[in-house]
Each structure stands twice: as structure tokens, then as C-alpha cells.
Amino acid sequence: MQVSVESTSALERRMTIGVPVERIETEVNKRLQQTASRAKIPGFRPGKVPMSVIRQRYEEAARQEALGDLIQSTFYEAIVAEKLNPAGAPSVEPKVFEKGKDLEYVATFEVFPEFEVAGFEAIEIERLQAEVTDADVDNMLEILRKQNTRFESVERAAENGDQVNIDFVGKIDGEAFAGGSAKGTQLVLGSGRMIPGFEDALVGAKAGEERVITPTFPEDYQNLDLAGKTAEFTVTVNSVAAPQLPELNEEFFAQFGVQEGGVEGFRAEVKKNMERELRQAIKTKVKNQVMEGLVAGNPIEVPKALVDNEVNRLRVQAVQQFGGNIKPDQLPAELFQEQAKRRVVLGLIVAEVVKQKELKPDEARVRELIEEMASAYQEPEQVVAWYYKNAEQLNEVRSVVLEEQVVDTVLQQAKVTDKSVSYEEAVKPAEAPQAA
């Protein structure tokens, strides 16, 4: 077998492979022999059909099968011999494909980039330090109460924060428009759910009252047919309801799975959850900075095949998340290109750090992470057991732990500065990272 390799770009390889005719004929004859042993042809006993008849009937099919198999097997032999690491399936172009001649074909493919990750000591990390105070717990209790607000009907004019039940009919230039009318809509005034000016115009209205309001759609409104236009809405207020915050009592605590301990028991449970959220937020922000530093300090080219595969995965995830009748391949690839490339870059860099530092998942940390996740459930022991019975889920946790170990490895050499902040600032979501 003859092999030659040409580098057509940084990652693309064009490999020409020649397979001797003798090897081809050996594979063809092997298939014909197998066919002869089981062929059923009228006038001949099974296994007694002359080879000339077998060749006449089956040689073409046997040759095509042999050539297809040889291309697969010789491609694998060639990349092993040439020490190449393809990043995707090759594009195969036959050059000589004739009976009685050596097979020659060209396989074009991308390879994984070869690089070493460096520059750990140049990465700057700001590690947040925070704690959950009593005031933070008080604030969280108020948030939980507001999230469980109930509205009770009142006989007074509507105020900001009240919930009104309304019917409305909207028109532009005297003509009704799609989505401009509804009945029985529940609307909390001041929530910003409707276009600017709509909710403000209903403050002071009473049940049974009808108001005509004329708000203007924003210039950047998602429906371009309505953007910038002034509409006239005839709104009928059916009812007004005032918000009622629930009391901190046993009934309220039970909604969150806390059955005993009263207010102090509930506060302790809330604080425990907040501390878990805080640890995770700080860890995530440190990890993001580490990954940003690794990407910035190790610019690499990535195979288009890997990016395309990641784009397809992101398309599928988007359809699963947002639903609808759209198919994944109907979503423009450009929407996901930057995110996909960044994921591929990070994946290759993290894998290289694991390889260079010879890292393996710390099983004690795997167990610790599973137990921490399980603690959020009512029966944590069952959750832990479930993870250890599901190999796929367990391997996902191991991958997370391995990434954490990569972060720890970088932190040992990076420039780390601790910064004391409030709980609220520590858990605030970070800005989205820039594309690689």
C-alpha cells in the first residue's frame, strides 16, 4: 500500500492511497467464495455451483463491496501509519477504480490541532469572597413571600402593584390588528408586561370602568408592522385585586418542604440553600475567568467539522428548549457559529490540559458533588443511588469534576486576587463571555 500526505491548510490533509490489485482480487475472491457456499441457482446443488457461473452473476457486486471495505480499512491503516488524528469523516475521491488496476483514491479530512497549553501564570483571577448575613436571609424571605403573592378583590381604584382583570380592543387608524384584542386578561400594574403607557393609564381605574388609552408601540418593537405606531385601546376593567403577602407560618413553610422548626427552622433551611447557591456562583465565576484566560492565552485553529457538529447540537437544543414546529436544520447556522466555535476551542484546550497534567477524575470529589446536588431533594440517598446506577449521568458528573480539577490546576499558577463583596453581588449572573 502506498500513501502520500499533503497539507492543504493548517488542519486539512489530502492523503493519496494506492492499494495493489493483488489485495483487491484477494478480497473479491474471498467474497465470491462466501457467495458460492450459499448461492441457490436452479440446476445446481447448493455449494456445487461452478465458479464461472458465480463470477458471471455476482462478481460486480462482490467487487463493489470489496472496494468499499478496502477504502475504509486502508484509510484507517494509513492514518495510523502516518500518525494522523482525523477530526471528522473524510471526503473520498476515487482516482483509479478500474478492474485489473491498482485502486487509487484521495481522502481529504481535517486533523485535530497539535498544541501545548501554556500561560497559566499570566491569567488574572478575581475570586469573590462573601457570606450570607441575617439581612440577606430577611431579603430572601421577602422575595419568597412576593413570589407567592395572592390577590384579593378590592372595591377601590387600582394602584401600581394591583392586579386588574381587563377586556381590551385595540385599533390603529380605526382598524383592528392581530393580537390587539383580548378578554379576561390578568395584568399586574407596573409589571411592564404591556407596551409603555398602557399600564400607567389604568392606574386609578375602578371595576366596571371603561377607559380609552393611546399608547405608542416602541420603535424597536418585535412586530415591525406595529413598531412606532400609536394605537387606541378601549379597555374595560372587570375587577381590581390587591396583593396580599402570605404570612410566615406553618402553611407557608410546608410549601417549601419544611415541616418542623417554625420560623427559625425555615430560616436555617433558606440560609443553607443560599450558601449552596453562593458557593456555586463563586465557583462558576472563577471557572469562567479561568476558561477566558486559557482561550485568550492559547489561540488555536479548530476543525470546521467539529464546529459544524457543535452547531447541529446547539440547533437541536434550541428546538427542544423553545419548541415549535421548526426543525433544527431550519435554524440558520450563523446564529450558533460563534458559540459553537467557543465550545470547541474550550473543549480542546481543557482536554489538552487534562492530557498534559495527566489528570483523572477524583472519585471523592465526584461523590461529594453528587451528595451536594442530592441535598436539594427530599430523599437525597435515593438521588445518590440513582447517579451510581446510571453510568451516563455518573460520567457527566465525572466530566464536571475533571473540569474543576483543570481549574484548580490553573489556579495554582494564576494570579489570584480575593475581593470581598455582598451576597447579592456574588450571586449576580456574570456577563456573557466574548466569542473565541
UniProtKB/Swiss-Prot annotation:
<dbReference type="InterPro" id="IPR005215">
    <property type="entry name" value="Trig_fac"/>
</dbReference>
<keyword id="KW-0963">Cytoplasm</keyword>
<dbReference type="InterPro" id="IPR008880">
    <property type="entry name" value="Trigger_fac_C"/>
</dbReference>
<dbReference type="Pfam" id="PF05698">
    <property type="entry name" value="Trigger_C"/>
</dbReference>
<dbReference type="GO" id="GO:0044183">
    <property type="term" value="F:protein folding chaperone"/>
</dbReference>
<protein>
    <recommendedName>
        <fullName>Trigger factor</fullName>
        <ecNumber>5.2.1.8</ecNumber>
    </recommendedName>
</protein>
<keyword id="KW-0143">Chaperone</keyword>
<dbReference type="InterPro" id="IPR008881">
    <property type="entry name" value="Trigger_fac_ribosome-bd_bac"/>
</dbReference>
<dbReference type="InterPro" id="IPR001179">
    <property type="entry name" value="PPIase_FKBP_dom"/>
</dbReference>
<dbReference type="GO" id="GO:0061077">
    <property type="term" value="P:chaperone-mediated protein folding"/>
</dbReference>
<keyword id="KW-0131">Cell cycle</keyword>
<comment type="function">
    <text>Involved in protein export. Acts as a chaperone by maintaining the newly synthesized protein in an open conformation. Functions as a peptidyl-prolyl cis-trans isomerase.</text>
</comment>
<feature type="domain" description="PPIase FKBP-type">
    <location>
        <begin position="161"/>
        <end position="246"/>
    </location>
</feature>
<dbReference type="GO" id="GO:0005737">
    <property type="term" value="C:cytoplasm"/>
</dbReference>
<dbReference type="GO" id="GO:0003755">
    <property type="term" value="F:peptidyl-prolyl cis-trans isomerase activity"/>
</dbReference>
<dbReference type="GO" id="GO:0015031">
    <property type="term" value="P:protein transport"/>
</dbReference>
<dbReference type="Pfam" id="PF00254">
    <property type="entry name" value="FKBP_C"/>
</dbReference>
<comment type="similarity">
    <text>Belongs to the FKBP-type PPIase family. Tig subfamily.</text>
</comment>
<dbReference type="InterPro" id="IPR037041">
    <property type="entry name" value="Trigger_fac_C_sf"/>
</dbReference>
<keyword id="KW-0697">Rotamase</keyword>
<dbReference type="GO" id="GO:0051301">
    <property type="term" value="P:cell division"/>
</dbReference>
<dbReference type="GO" id="GO:0043022">
    <property type="term" value="F:ribosome binding"/>
</dbReference>
<dbReference type="InterPro" id="IPR036611">
    <property type="entry name" value="Trigger_fac_ribosome-bd_sf"/>
</dbReference>
<keyword id="KW-0132">Cell division</keyword>
<dbReference type="InterPro" id="IPR027304">
    <property type="entry name" value="Trigger_fact/SurA_dom_sf"/>
</dbReference>
<dbReference type="InterPro" id="IPR046357">
    <property type="entry name" value="PPIase_dom_sf"/>
</dbReference>
<keyword id="KW-0413">Isomerase</keyword>
<dbReference type="GO" id="GO:0043335">
    <property type="term" value="P:protein unfolding"/>
</dbReference>
<dbReference type="Pfam" id="PF05697">
    <property type="entry name" value="Trigger_N"/>
</dbReference>
<dbReference type="GO" id="GO:0051083">
    <property type="term" value="P:'de novo' cotranslational protein folding"/>
</dbReference>
